[in-house]
Amino acid sequence: MRQILLAIALIAAPVAAFTSFELYTSTAPAETVGLGDLSSFRTIIADVQTLASKGDLAGAAKRITDYETAWDQAETAIRPLNQHDWSNIDAASDTALKALRQSAPSADKVSKTLAALMTVLSNPAQPAQ
């Protein structure tokens, strides 16, 4: 009789432990990885916003080229960290670049796209509106 009880205990203990572990890992929220320090990109976009708010859209277009170059160079390091967040920023970047590079850029559209890009740079998990 003791041997049967011992056998049941030796079987039940690992089963309970493994089951508990499986339940815990399946209900624990997935941890997302950030993109690291994006402050240098925010600084450049703040400069672009300042130029655009002063009406210097040509200067803003030149300055956003610095952003584009830095963003493209950092892609291989940043993109693998979090594809979703990177894509959100990249889409907002493309929209801002397009707005500034139109033959006759609209100051209002440029302002809105730059604000959206700055918002996404501050919170990459949220796509631009």
Can you describe what each PLM-predicted range is?
Residues 24-129:
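Mature extracytoplasmic or organellar-lumen-exposed domains after removal of signal/transit peptides
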Residues 7-18:
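Hydrophobic membrane-insertion alpha-helices, especially the h-region
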Residues 1-4:
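Positively charged n-region of N-terminal signal peptides that target proteins for export
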